[in-house]
């Protein structure tokens, strides 16, 4: 049963990634902001997240204000790409963080990251989280973004305490 469940999740993840890749860049930027808000970043405020991506956006596609005053901000970069993201793109994003006087960022792509990109984020003082297409869809499924529940099953077992005679 577990094997079948995992296959369904994998198939759903692949189908969901297909939908995300077909979406417009603007929709994708809004999606990543929505996802981080649903995950609890920005607290319960409705105005905590904003998609800001456009030409001349300085390499920032979205922002999440973690507190009411906006003193602590997470900056987002969203790339709806087929090719893997390299360390050059991550360095550019870190440069954008420096330009914003920020120290936290999340770089999300529909593809993946090169080994160099993964290694680069380990060497910098800025806190940058990389989310690839697989992790993106996993987080979307876990947080019910772009998916809906169809059916659920309760698996039961014998309650041996009930049958214990005194």
Predicted regions and their residues:
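Mixed-charge (Asp/Glu-Lys/Arg
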Residues: 1-166
